[in-house]
């Protein structure tokens, strides 16, 4: 009889723990960070040496380093959406190809 009591207590603790995880997972969905999915307008773009280079950039780096991010379906689910938004914000801050401006040529110092 004691063994059945211990199994029952373990089952109750497991059910309560899973319920808390489910409740927390539901509540965090209402935190809005990471779901704006805004793509500001493209101001300028680098002069690519070939269409292949542009294609390679956008395939490998463009989602985080441009304003032309293709947001995957799972970017709407917290906490994954928070991580993706953080990575995109960080990537755009470091280098954003959609705001690329060439520097004016410097005059030679005399």
What are these regions (language model features)?
Residues 15, 49, 72:
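Conserved aromatic-histidine-acidic binding/catalytic patches
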Residues 57-69:
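The canonical Cys-X-X-Cys-His
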Residues 28-31, 58, 85-88:
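Short, compositionally biased low-complexity segments
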Residues 12-32:
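Hydrophobic membrane-insertion alpha-helices, especially the h-region
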Residues 1-8:
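N-terminal Lys/Arg-rich, disordered targeting/topogenic segments
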Residues 69-108:
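Gly/Gly-Pro-rich "capping" loops immediately C-terminal to redox-active cysteine motifs
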Residues 11-14, 106-110:
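Metalloprotease/metallohydrolase-associated module, dominated by Zn2+-dependent proteases
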Residues 36-57:
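Electrostatic cytochrome c docking/interface patches
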């Amino acid at each position: 009889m004691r063994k059945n009591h211990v199994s029952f207590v373990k089952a109750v603790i497991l059910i309560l723990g899973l319920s808390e995880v489910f409740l927390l997972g539901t509540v965090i969905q209402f935190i809005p960070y990471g779901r704006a999915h805004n793509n500001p307008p493209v101001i300028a773009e680098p002069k690519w040496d070939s269409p292949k280079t542009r294609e390679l950039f956008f395939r490998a780096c463009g989602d985080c380093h441009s304003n032309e991010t293709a947001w995957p379906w799972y970017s709407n689910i917290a906490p994954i959406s928070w991580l993706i938004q953080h990575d995109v914000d960080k990537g755009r801050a470091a280098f954003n190809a959609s705001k690329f401006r060439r520097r004016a040529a410097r005059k030679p110092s005399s």
